[in-house]
Amino acid sequence: MNAPRCLRRLLERQWRQGGWLSTLLRPLAALTGLVVARKRNAYLTGARAAWRAPVPVVVVGNIYVGGTGKTPVVIEVVRQLQARGWTPGVVSRGYGVDVGAAPRVGQGQLAAADYGDEPALIARATGAAIAVHPHRPRAVQALLRAHPGVDVVVSDDGLQHLALARDVEIVVQDERGVGNGRLLPVGPLREPAQRLADVDAIVTNAGRPRAAAAPAAGAPRQLAMWLEPTHAQRVTDGATRTLADLAALPPARLAAAAGIGNPARFFQTLEQAGIRPAHTLALPDHYAYAQSPFTALDADLILVTAKDAIKCAALDDPRLWAVQVGTRLSDPDFGDWLSATLRARQP
């Protein structure tokens, strides 16, 4: 195991249990809090100016470092807006891609090597135009130049990118909530937990169906999200199999692999659908698949996420099947609320 992964696991253990390292790192957490507060106050007081786009902006992000399930929420937000007559475009950092000075703008079947894993998946799932660049205002400007019909921008991540003014903030968390409630590196938080009181909605990736919380006046809208597998699609040729077919296979001949922020969540989703692979392979997030990690897997069929499937295609392994999922929300009125909120906040 490489050094960065070992350090990450050590930190995560300290976040859960405490210990000598947490005590040692407390001064750094205090420094994190100071830097975050100064940056936010600079924008709130006008000392630093945020750039405002000529169209509404929805930011989907988190305060918990690591994978909480933002990408499915971004996809669902785009689809909900499309269903209500909006023409959304998406901006993203393009993690792991050397974009260069100018933003990269595309649409449709984008390559992960050119745009990043999440942007490629979002573009394929929604058909929305997408621009990638670390500087969010620059990405929005390029997106609107290339696609002037876009009338709302959805920012994939970017809650902490305050240089881009936003009209709606949606935070995605999982059942870990705010963890131990401490800032990096003593805890998992990029911003203080109190930041959640300022956002418009909090979506909890519950992993299973859950009822929506009753809206409270003046508080963020609270709802749950979970992923529901629909079918599997072979990576090499697009052939499909039903969930019942997969569940009927002998577990000993079935494997599952995931190179996402929280691989265990993917394996749990399969189990809830009655699919119990005997072999599971947890890979690092944004795994490149430059070489096949499946060579030693003794399985007739290997299930992967849709995000992994984009990069697995080059492996030309007929055992690989991408599990397609639908995003379910506990709040049936979320899309109407989001659309109405955006229209109310338009100048």
Swiss-Prot record:
Keyword Nucleus: no
Pathway: Glycolipid biosynthesis; lipid IV(A) biosynthesis; lipid IV(A) from (3R)-3-hydroxytetradecanoyl-[acyl-carrier-protein] and UDP-N-acetyl-alpha-D-glucosamine: step 6/6
KW Transmembrane helix (keyword) present: no
InterPro entries assigned to the protein according to its UniProt record, in alphabetical order: LpxK, P-loop_NTPase
Keywords: ATP-binding, Kinase, Lipid A biosynthesis, Lipid biosynthesis, Lipid metabolism, Nucleotide-binding, Transferase
MF terms (GO), sorted A to Z: ATP binding; tetraacyldisaccharide 4'-kinase activity
GO cellular component term of the entry, any: plasma membrane
Gene Ontology terms describing biological process: lipid A biosynthetic process; lipopolysaccharide core region biosynthetic process
Amino acids binding ATP: 64-71
EC number assigned by the record: 2.7.1.130
Catalytic class of the enzyme: transferase
One Pfam family from the record: LpxK
Catalytic activity: a lipid A disaccharide + ATP = a lipid IVA + ADP + H(+)
Functional description taken from the UniProt entry: Transfers the gamma-phosphate of ATP to the 4'-position of a tetraacyldisaccharide 1-phosphate intermediate (termed DS-1-P) to form tetraacyldisaccharide 1,4'-bis-phosphate (lipid IVA).
Family assignment from sequence similarity: Belongs to the LpxK family.
The protein, known as: Tetraacyldisaccharide 4'-kinase
